[in-house]
């Protein structure tokens, strides 16, 4: 394990081959050396990186947000968490089938690649997306606000949190989407807390706002807090159950 975060490092020397965890976040790094083959977790967020070296095949967690990345290398087939928000990315490489959490907000995407069937969290807000790919049945959290979406694809039945305000959405295409949204609203009186934003359905929005206090939602369940809850915790069940 190598922890060298929160210094003023501008470069890293050659790395030991047996490293499995590297945390070099909160530095002034412009590049990274070749990564060890056995590396599983790489935290390199809050640097000045413009690119990443080839990723090891065993990598499961990649937190590279708040950099100046313009592209990502081929992703490991074992990758479960990818947090690349707030970069200068215009495309994503093919996403691995094991990916569970994808956070790619605040980039310049006009589209996303096909999503993993295991994906449970998708945060793609503040991009230039005109459509979303197929959303698979395991998806539970969806943040796609502040894009250019005109419609929503079919929503998974397990979806518990959805936020899609600030999009030019004209209609919810399928009746199944309406049913799912109704179920989400119904669950507001249960133990789960939900953050749900609607701009194009005023009556529904006002009804929702009467059920739970708007300040509480915005303060505690705004998408920006999702990063804090998840970026260092790969066990999504623990995180979600703590809400």
Segment roles from a protein language model:
Residues 2-4, 22-24, 42-44, 62-64, ...:
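Conserved hydrophobic beta-strand positions in leucine-rich repeat
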Residues 3, 10, 169-171:
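Catalytic phosphate/metal-binding cores of nucleic-acid and nucleotide-processing enzymes, i.e., regions
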Residues 6, 11, 16, 30, ...:
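Intrinsically disordered, low-complexity tandem-repeat regions
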Residues 12-15, 32-35, 52-55, 72-75, ...:
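Canonical leucine-rich repeat
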Residues 15-20, 35-40, 57-60, 76-80, ...:
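Leucine-rich repeat
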